[in-house]
């Protein structure tokens, strides 16, 4: 059967009462979830992918608050990945999990591309093996990969230096590990809508739930687009379609 997945990223949650770049990141996250849950009431939601930089103040209480906020709107499985602003140990202490979400037809698999407090992607051999072990857990027909860092250039030089190196080799390796079931990938980090391909695989970057980075900017710059998220529609024949949504705040 078809699956519908909500993809959020780069929430940058801070301590209560604080803001980041003049943005109340809890308010923008709640605005995203409030709109998304209304859409889910019509079209459904089977799971959530939260692809990193979920906290900007990366403490266990902030991650616990993130989980509480999400649970105010949704009661579905969530695949949670760390980003470069996250601290994996604090996420794990809060109960956030990179364990795969597996149905009979689709398998949502995380690949950790982060290193605590460093912007550049880092995928170690242990990260690869963890993903391979996750892929071995299920026999779903199709696999969707989730990372934090981009798998393609986003045409922002200051961001592109942090992208995943050797994406085609990586995707080929993961496809082999999944017994040729890999259908595509999603990522965060770029704070903007991205669509591209790595070899034959479609890859989709999602806007941030808070502020956006200006597309095609050679240096750090904030865009005027609103908070965003994307719906991933996973068909029973292995196709992935996505719909980007924005909220007005």
Regions found by a protein language model. Give the residues of each.
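Active-site-proximal beta-strand elements of phosphoester/diester hydrolases
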Residues: 3-15, 105-115, 144-148, 201-207, ...
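His/acidic metal-ligating clusters that form di-metal
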Residues: 32-47, 119-204, 238-240
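Alpha-helical scaffolding within the catalytic cores
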Residues: 31, 89-99, 131, 190
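N-terminal active-site segment of His-dependent metallophosphoesterases
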Residues: 1-65, 154
């Amino acid at each position: 059967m078809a699956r519908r997945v909500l993809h959020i990223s780069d929430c940058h949650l801070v301590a209560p009462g604080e803001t980041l770049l003049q943005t109340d990141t809890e308010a923008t996250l709640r605005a995203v979830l409030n709109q998304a849950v209304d859409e889910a009431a019509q079209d459904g939601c089977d799971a959530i992918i939260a692809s990193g930089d979920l906290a900007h103040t990366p403490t266990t209480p902030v991650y616990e608050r993130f989980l509480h906020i999400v649970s105010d709107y949704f009661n579905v499985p969530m695949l949670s990945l760390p980003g470069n602003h996250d601290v994996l140990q604090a996420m794990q202490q809060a109960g956030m999990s990179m364990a795969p979400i597996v149905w009979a037809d689709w398998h949502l698999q995380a690949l950790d591309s982060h290193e605590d407090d460093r912007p550049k992607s880092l995928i170690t051999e242990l990260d690869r093996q963890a993903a391979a072990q996750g892929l071995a857990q299920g026999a779903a027909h199709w696999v969707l990969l989730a990372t934090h860092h981009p798998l393609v250039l986003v045409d922002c030089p200051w961001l592109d230096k942090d992208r995943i190196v050797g994406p085609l080799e990586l995707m080929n390796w993961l496809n082999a590990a999944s017994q040729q079931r890999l259908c595509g990938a999603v990522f965060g980090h770029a704070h903007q809508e991205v669509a591209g391909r790595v070899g034959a695989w479609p890859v989709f970057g999602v806007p941030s739930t808070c502020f956006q980075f200006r597309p095609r900017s050679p240096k750090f710059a904030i865009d005027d687009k609103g908070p965003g998220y994307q719906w991933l529609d996973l068909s029973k024949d292995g196709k992935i379609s996505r719909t980007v949504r924005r909220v007005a705040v």
